[in-house]
């Protein structure tokens, strides 16, 4: 089965700084395209979408331009770039004007789980996210489970924007806490302009003793809520390596979904990504 990875990261510490890596020594080194290709080897990953990795703000524009150049190179699967952005800023539109126009630029992400809740609730933030529609860009939502009501409000105010919820809304997998995450997901899934990325969950599991069964209730509820036409596979590499290899995560998700049949698995691992991220 061909795979489109809708959530890969790269970071080059010789070029840019990512302050959050200081607290994660396992990840605090450069991860470049050759490393990604080695991790995905043999898994038939035919395309990928790069998600910004919360680069320090002074490097946002340079990182985006660097990734767009990389996406144009012929020897890698990069088909789309989701760039870093600050919708809470009054200068957001001028920032967008500097990066739009490249066909591989697909969307914007602002990591909210590291920010005060007021950031995602702000009037300027919501107005600027709503404006992404006019740029032809989507928005990746990256929040903790407790912040999902913020995501629900945001989506309700931006009916024309394509939204992708990253990491199933970051449930507490290790602690096996399903509620209130479960009801929030059910509510968010009512908005048909939102898709859910089945990604990141293995990184939130117990790194020493996780199994596919630990992930299953979260994955099955997300899929049941959004349906097979609005779920996407993402590796979250290299963050997934905190608990599992790229291959281990893929095989766990394939095992969890094998009873759904080949057509639905193909939607999850490939077809939906083409539509949601507007890939070739």
Where are these regions (language model features)?
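An N-terminally biased module of ancient metal coordination in phosphate/nucleic-acid-related enzymes
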Residues: 1-68, 251
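Active-site gating/metal-coordination segments in enzymes
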Residues: 61-147, 153-155, 197-201, 208-209
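Short, electropositive alpha-helical surface patch
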Residues: 58-77, 164-165, 215-224, 247-256
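Conserved, mostly hydrophobic/aromatic
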Residues: 7, 48, 67, 81, ...
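Catalytic pocket-lining loop regions of alpha/beta-barrel enzymes
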Residues: 121-232
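Mid-to-C-terminal alpha-helical segments outside catalytic/metal-binding sites
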Residues: 1-4, 29-47, 221, 225-232, ...
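A generic "structured core" feature
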Residues: 2-11, 15, 41, 113, ...
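Active-site environment of divalent metal-dependent phosphoester hydrolases
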Residues: 11-14, 55-58, 88-91, 113-116, ...
């Amino acid at each position: 089965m061909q795979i489109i990875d809708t959530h890969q990261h790269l970071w080059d510490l010789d070029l840019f700084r990512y302050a959050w890596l200081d607290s994660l020594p396992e990840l605090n080194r450069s991860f470049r395209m050759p490393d990604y290709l080695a991790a995905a080897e043999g898994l038939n990953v035919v395309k990928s979408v790069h998600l910004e990795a919360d680069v320090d703000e002074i490097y946002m524009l340079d990182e985006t331009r660097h990734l767009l150049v990389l996406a144009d190179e012929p020897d890698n699967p990069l088909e789309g770039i989701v760039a870093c952005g600050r919708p809470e800023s009054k200068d957001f539109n001028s920032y967008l004007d500097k990066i739009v126009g490249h066909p591989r630029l697909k969307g914007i992400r602002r990591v909210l789980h590291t920010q005060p809740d007021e950031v995602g609730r702000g009037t300027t933030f919501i107005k600027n996210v709503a404006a992404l529609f006019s740029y032809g860009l989507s928005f990746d939502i990256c929040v903790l489970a407790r912040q999902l009501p913020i995501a629900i409000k945001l989506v309700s105010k931006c009916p024309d924007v394509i939204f992708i919820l990253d990491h199933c809304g970051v449930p507490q997998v290790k602690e096996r806490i399903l509620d209130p995450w479960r009801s929030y997901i059910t509510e968010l899934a009512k908005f048909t302009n939102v898709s859910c990325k089945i990604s990141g969950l293995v990184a939130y599991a117990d790194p020493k003793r996780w199994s596919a069964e630990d992930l299953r209730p979260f994955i099955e509820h997300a899929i049941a809520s959004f349906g097979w036409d609005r779920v996407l596979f993402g590796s979250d590499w290299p963050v997934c390596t905190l608990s599992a290899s790229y291959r281990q995560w893929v095989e766990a998700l394939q095992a969890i979904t094998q009873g759904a049949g080949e057509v639905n698995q193909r939607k999850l691992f490939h077809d939906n990504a083409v539509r949601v991220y507007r890939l070739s």
